[in-house]
Amino acid sequence: MIKSALLVLEDGTQFHGRAIGAEGTAVGEVVFNTSMTGYQEILTDPSYSRQIVTLTYPHIGNVGTNASDEESSAVHAQGLVIRDLPLIASNYRNEEGLSEYLKRHNIVAIADIDTRKLTRLLREKGAQNGCIIVGELSDAALALEKAKAFPGLKGMDLAKEVTTKEMYQWLQGSWTLEGDLPAAKQPEDLPFHVVAYDYGVKRNILRMLVDRGCRLTVVPAQTPAEDVLKLNPDGIFLSNGPGDPEPCDYAITAIKRFLETDIPVFGICLGHQLLALASGAKTVKMKFGHHGGNHPVKDLDASCVMITAQNHGFAVDETSLPSNLRTTHVSLFDGSLQGLHRTDKAAFSFQGHPEASPGPHDAAPLFDHFIELIEAYRASSVSLNCSNSHK
């Protein structure tokens, strides 16, 4: 049976459509994503916690869903807004239709609305709080009340909500065209030990690090720095994640401690912002953020342009950079800061998503740079140990 659904924004704008997910309400910040594919990866990306995602591509659900394409163990998006849900999912890897998938994960979603109009509104007015409501459509006032009551993401620490509860090891590499996801590698076949902070980490980040020889120990967001240093890592990775970076004082404190050492540090998305804050810079809330797989970014060091995947609503304020931070990448859409490198430490970060999933892999060489820093750190450590042994 077809059920009606209603999306109401905090400014009172209403969109009437059809329910394609669970019954109930979904309240959060409404954003738009311009990716043409990868809706399952988007839904399971922890960075979308407390957000209602509008997908601008008109046909969503064409290839169904499957367990291998999930970026985490749960759906983190608060709700989903699309134009059209195809009747048939055509893909040999399909295990479950999108509508059934949403219902199983208790995600409220709406289809058959004018997503172009909604996107233009969000672009012009900025990201707005909103509410999708199913089953109580006669009370649009209730939906508006819920939308206005949502406090917004500014000041909201969500990393500690989506992080893993326990430390774990990750040894699995990337999916290949010859088959499905590969079996986990043997630890002895992975020469580099990297500790990855899970602020909402995506699985494809972990896979791409394993592809480059990293044996990963993934730790909860609030793990003290001294506990990590006891693990003797060759490198420290700061993951993506949702919410405002400024309230994550536990992370900033830990990163400051790591920067007192010579261990290489690499941050992505929220991790990029946290590295900047730990170095003395500031962050700001963006008007409507960057969400999509077609964002051009200029690499200032290589003087080239990369097409990147983006998903962030906060950014580092370039005017606040201290002297030991230099800009390495900038957005060609709005000029916002996209990459940083410490001038005094082996620490760097990128605002976009070099692992994509979904999106292009133009920025994937950033993982290679991390490995180069790790190799240099290990070489210097060996040299130091040798000189000490001869004293």
From Swiss-Prot:
Pathway: Amino-acid biosynthesis; L-arginine biosynthesis; carbamoyl phosphate from bicarbonate: step 1/1; Pyrimidine metabolism; UMP biosynthesis via de novo pathway; (S)-dihydroorotate from bicarbonate: step 1/3. Residues 193-380 form the Glutamine amidotransferase type-1 domain. L-glutamine binds at S47, G241, G243, L270, Q273, N311, G313, F314. Its EC number is 6.3.5.5. Pfam families: CPSase_sm_chain, GATase. Keywords: Amino-acid biosynthesis, Arginine biosynthesis, ATP-binding, Glutamine amidotransferase, Ligase, Nucleotide-binding, Pyrimidine biosynthesis. This is Carbamoyl phosphate synthase small chain. It comes from Yersinia pestis. The gene is carA.
